[in-house]
Structure formats: C-alpha cells, structure tokens
C-alpha cells in the first residue's frame, strides 16, 4: 500500500509551496517532514489528507485506505464543550458514521485512553487539559481511527518531555504495525533518532530519502540525487541541512 507522488506541485492560488515533487513511499514508512516555517510542510500533509488538491501532478494513495490527520494545536478549539472521551469517540465517525450506535466500540475507546495514559481524565472537559494532555487525547482519537496512513503536523509543539517521549513510542509502534506515518517537525535530534526517512522542503523543492543522507555528523555533507530531483548539491558548512540551524552531535 504505497503512497506515490508524481510531479506534484502544491500551493494556494499563485503561491507555490512545493514544485514537481516525485517520490514513492512504501507502506510502513516512518517519515519526518522538515523545512523552515512556511516552507510547505502543512500544505503537503493537507494534500495527502485530501483537504487540498495538487495544482499539478497527482498523489496516489491505496484504494480504501484510511487516513488520520492531526492538525497543529493552534488549529484546535480547546473551548469546544466536550470531554476527553467524546473527543476520542469522534475518531469513529469516519467508518461507523455520526448516528450509528458506538457502544460496541467502548472497549476500543477505553483501550485508546489507557494507551495514552488518560483513563482518569476521560470525563474532563478539553479546556481543563494541559497542552500535553490535549495532545494525548488527540493521539487516542487517532488510535480508534485505525488508519493506514497517519499524518501529524508539529505534534510536539508546546508539550512536556515525558509526553513527547510517550507519543514518540506510540508513533514507533504504529510504524511497527505496518502503518505509514508522516510527521512535520523541526527538531533534528528527534528526526535523527526516530525517523528513518525524511522529506526536506527548501525553496519550493522537496527531497525524499534516507535520513542519513541529510544528517551527517561531519562538517561536509552531500545531498545526493534523490527521487524527486536530479540536482546534486555539495556543501561545506556547520549548519543542519534540515533548517539551517546549528547542528551538534553530543
């Protein structure tokens, strides 16, 4: 169940974010999406989710595949009057509908809450949750969706270290189950440790390959020819190829 991009150009109106991206992501890939703010990371995730259409080219997904998409927390209204369990239940809508009896899925919801450590907060309203607790609840919602492709947009922003550690373990578990996970993020150390593949977006160009091709602990690094572009760049600098920030291996 591969995810394919064929000369895909993405953007809004006359503003192009990604131009002519081609790549083939095998089922079970664990991919970090990196780039500066506004580079097009969110645009790429929205296109995969089907929320926007490519300006040119196409994105091919497996037929009947389920997709779970988690937007950035700033796009989520935490004052909406529902509790944690109800939020998690909304993950069932994609395959059982809004009005169908959801009681047969109670054990699935309970299991999801246990996996993210929120059993005791099931009846708490969203506005009482910390940033980390809200993100745990949103990950529980993804669990009940039972998706083949999981898209996460900056899932670690504004959360504590323990929550980040637990959610990274869950992401790794999803990948081990054969699910394809794409995650937009900035931290090069997290990318290096947990994500075997990555998509780097830079000035409308997107490059896909093994993370080791992008992150090198030497001063010299080479961006080899990748699927999406025949361009070969050789550079000598002390900066991370992810976001031009200082990169140190400790």
Please give the residue ranges for each predicted region.
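The feature captures the beta-strand-to-loop junction immediately N-terminal to the Walker
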Residues: 34-36
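ABC ATPase nucleotide-binding domains
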Residues: 211-250
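Conserved ABC ATPase signature
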Residues: 125-129, 133
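H-loop (His-switch) and adjacent beta-strand-loop-beta switch element
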Residues: 196-211
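H-loop/switch region of ABC-family ATPase nucleotide-binding domains
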Residues: 185-186
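Conserved ABC ATPase "signature" region
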Residues: 103-121
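Catalytic Walker B motif of ABC-type/P-loop ATPase nucleotide-binding domains
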Residues: 150-154
């Amino acid at each position: 169940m591969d995810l394919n991009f064929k000369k895909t150009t993405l953007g809004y109106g006359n503003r192009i974010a990604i131009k002519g991206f081609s790549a083939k992501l095998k089922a079970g890939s664990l991919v970090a999406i990196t780039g500066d703010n506004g580079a097009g990371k969110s645009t790429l995730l929205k296109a995969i989710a089907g929320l926007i259409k490519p300006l040119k080219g196409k994105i091919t997904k497996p037929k009947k595949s389920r997709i779970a998409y988690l937007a950035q927390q700033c796009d989520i209204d935490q004052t909406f009057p529902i509790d944690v369990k109800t939020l998690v239940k909304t993950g069932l809508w994609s395959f059982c509908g809004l009005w169908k009896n959801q009681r047969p899925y109670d054990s699935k919801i309970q299991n999801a809450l246990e996996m993210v450590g929120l059993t005791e907060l099931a009846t708490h309203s969203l506005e009482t949750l910390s940033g980390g607790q809200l993100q745990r609840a949103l990950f529980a919602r993804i669990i009940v969706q039972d998706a083949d492709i999981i898209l996460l947009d900056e899932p670690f922003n504004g959360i504590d270290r323990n929550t980040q550690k637990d959610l990274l373990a869950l992401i790794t578990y999803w990948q081990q189950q054969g699910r394809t996970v794409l995650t937009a993020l900035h931290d090069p150390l997290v990318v290096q440790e947990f994500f075997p593949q990555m998509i780097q977006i830079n000035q409308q160009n997107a490059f896909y390959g093994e993370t080791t091709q992008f992150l090198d602990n030497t001063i010299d690094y080479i961006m080899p020819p990748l699927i999406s572009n025949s361009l070969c760049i050789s550079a000598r600098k002390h900066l991370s190829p992810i976001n031009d920030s200082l990169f140190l291996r400790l």
